[in-house]
């Protein structure tokens, strides 16, 4: 593919062969063989995806572990090939039920959040923030696109929107990963450490968004291990997230051509537990 050869030329990498790992939504990922070495090159055709290049640089500057970046251009990253690493392996589905892995990834998230508070306070004004999607306009669009206009929960939410949004704006922000799943995880072969990679959705937010994101994918036992290692979270953030995350996730789902399966449970929740979550939020206000 032309884009791969163009970026490799910029990087000064001779390519003996390559195989495409991903080619979707303007992001092309390929494994490159150059002599006796193997790399992974990630090429970005859209500006909104190019922020991942800067996000790698940001995490390195903060001392948050990432996979190794060999080189970069303004449109591509040349990364170590984890499949050839003597130390690490890519995450597997079984990791989601492994308490040891749960503990190790908690260490990474705790470091990300602790280092992120200061950075966001000083330099995070323009960072991606999923909470920006919590608007009355987006709520109206969700109702229309999902045909859920008659759900009583929407009335209760709109009545309390101003107070909830005020608390949301005041919530302390840190760097948040926003994209947890085993396919985005790297684990040490001896399980001594673990880290996340793929940083396109990295942004700012309150820390509990990541905690919820991780716990939703881990088994109960692995989740308990994660929380034991991560430590306490702010219960007000949880109450806030219980409401805001439903709107944000449904908004993102409604941007798809077809409504995704992973958002169906939240749509069903509009007529069940969502009202209870809003009522709980009202008690916090």
Q: What are the functions of these language-model segments?
A:
Residues 103, 213, 221, 228-285:
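Helix-rich C-terminal or lid/interface subdomains of diverse kinases
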Residues 27, 33-122:
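ATP-binding pocket architecture of kinase catalytic cores
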Residues 2-9, 117-178, 188, 270-284:
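An alpha-helical support segment within catalytic cores of ATP-dependent transferases
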Residues 42-43, 177-178, 198:
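Short beta-strand segments
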Residues 1-72, 169, 188-194, 283-285:
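Conserved NTP-binding catalytic cores of kinases and kinase-like/nucleotidyltransferase enzymes
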Residues 14-18, 150-154, 233-241:
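Short, surface-exposed acidic
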Residues 175, 188-229, 235:
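Active-site Asp-x-Gly
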């Amino acid at each position: 593919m032309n884009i791969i050869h163009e970026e490799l030329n910029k990087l000064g990498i001779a390519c003996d062969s390559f195989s495409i790992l991903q080619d979707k939504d303007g992001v092309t990922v390929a494994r490159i063989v150059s002599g006796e070495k193997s790399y992974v090159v990630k090429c970005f055709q859209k500006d909104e995806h190019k922020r991942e290049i800067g996000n790698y640089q940001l995490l390195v500057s903060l001392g948050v572990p990432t996979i190794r970046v060999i080189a970069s251009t303004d449109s591509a990253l040349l990364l170590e090939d984890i499949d050839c690493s003597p130390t690490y392996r890519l995450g597997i589905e079984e990791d989601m039920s492994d308490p040891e892995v749960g503990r190790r990834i908690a260490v990474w998230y705790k470091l990300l959040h602790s280092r992120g508070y200061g950075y966001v306070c000083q330099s995070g004004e323009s960072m991606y923030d999923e909470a920006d999607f919590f608007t009355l306009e987006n709520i109206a669009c969700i109702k229309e696109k999902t045909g859920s206009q008659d759900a009583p929960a929407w009335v209760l939410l709109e009545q309390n929107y101003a107070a909830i949004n005020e608390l949301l704006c005041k919530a302390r922000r840190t760097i948040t990963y926003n994209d947890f799943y085993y396919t985005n995880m790297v684990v040490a072969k001896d399980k001594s450490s673990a880290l996340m990679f793929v940083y396109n959705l990295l942004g700012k937010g309150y820390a509990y968004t990541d905690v919820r994101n991780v716990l939703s994918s881990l088994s109960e036992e692995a989740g308990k291990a994660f929380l034991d290692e991560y430590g306490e979270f702010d219960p007000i953030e949880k109450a806030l997230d219980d409401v805001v995350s439903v709107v944000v996730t449904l908004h993102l789902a409604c941007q798809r051509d077809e409504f995704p399966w992973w958002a169906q449970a939240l749509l069903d929740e509009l007529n069940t537990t969502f009202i209870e979550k809003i009522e709980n939020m009202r008690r916090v206000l």
